[in-house]
Amino acid sequence: MVNHFRIDRVGMEIKREVNEILQKKVRDPRVQGVTITDVQMLGDLSVAKVYYTILSNLASDNQKAQIGLEKATGTIKRELGRNLKLYKIPDLTFVKDESIEYGNKIDEMLRNLDKN
């Protein structure tokens, strides 16, 4: 039986810790301005899909952030191992969160409707 409460709790802890690690431990300029928005865990806690956003809308900055996060994965996992009491630290997969951009686009469309 899968304990969804534990999965969600571990996901929230990983989200909090990864945000803190990116701010304090990772010195790569490519990941400056990256914010972790959500973490989805696999049922056995072996894989964590980490969703992130970046302040810039430029495609080149998004690509650089993705590369920077992939390069920093080892450091992030090591720090997670120090800070979390888990049997095995999950493998991390970083995915750009498109939901904020989508929401901004809808807000803009609604504002344009109000003007007309």
From Swiss-Prot:
Which keywords does UniProt give here? Answer: Cytoplasm, Ribosome biogenesis
Provide GO CC annotations from the record.
cytosol
Pfam families with a match to the protein in the record: RBFA
GO BP terms: namely: maturation of SSU-rRNA; ribosome biogenesis
Name any one GO molecular function.
ribosomal small subunit binding
- Main subcellular location of this protein, as a coarse class: cytoplasm
Top-level taxonomic group:
Bacteria
Where in the cell does this protein reside? Cytoplasm
Supply the HAMAP family for this chain.
Answer: RbfA (MF_00003)
Q: What does this protein do?
A: One of several proteins that assist in the late maturation steps of the functional core of the 30S ribosomal subunit. Associates with free 30S ribosomal subunits (but not with 30S subunits that are part of 70S ribosomes or polysomes). Required for efficient processing of 16S rRNA. May interact with the 5'-terminal helix region of 16S rRNA.
Family of this protein: Belongs to the RbfA family.
Q: What does the annotation say about its assembly with partners?
A: Monomer. Binds 30S ribosomal subunits, but not 50S ribosomal subunits or 70S ribosomes.
- Protein name in UniProt: Ribosome-binding factor A
Q: Which organism is it from?
A: Streptococcus pneumoniae (strain ATCC BAA-255 / R6)
